[in-house]
């Protein structure tokens, strides 16, 4: 006998913050290179531009993960040396995904970085969705730790 699992849409958000012992300018240089994601995000094999624009609103990147899954992301907001916001248009089991990476100097040598996102799933079970949320949270945390290590060298 198979159990009938009810599938529906789910919504959640993730917010992860880390303190980095590096100047705001150094942190911004690293994160604002949107095709440089593979230098600090875990399980990212490569990131390529899909647009002529490399920075600011309208820049588009394609992320290829080590398992060969891909995600397409479009920058939709940008404030130099403060934040950028992007949406995923392909590659996730979601109907909507918007994320912002922002920085705030705490002093000349320490910067607070926050990565937060909101998402709404395609139809899936609650258990599947919670697994996805856990995976995304771990991806953010481990990637931010990598970023911190690379900037504090």
Task: Please name every model-derived segment.
Residues 1, 43-44, 54-57, 81-87:
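Short Pro/Gly-enriched beta-strand edge/turn motifs at strand-loop
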Residues 47, 61, 84-86, 113:
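Well-ordered beta-strand positions enriched in small/hydrophobic/aromatic, beta-favoring residues
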Residues 1-51:
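Hydrophobic ligand-binding cavity/cleft-lining segments
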Residues 14-16, 59-61, 73, 99, ...:
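Hydrophobic residues positioned within well-ordered beta-strands of beta-sheet architectures
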Residues 38, 65-110, 118-121, 149-150:
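Hydrophobic-ligand binding "helix-grip"
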Residues 2-6, 59-62, 87-89, 101:
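Short, P/G- and charge-enriched loop/turn segments at secondary-structure junctions
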Residues 112, 119-153:
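A conserved amphipathic terminal alpha-helix motif
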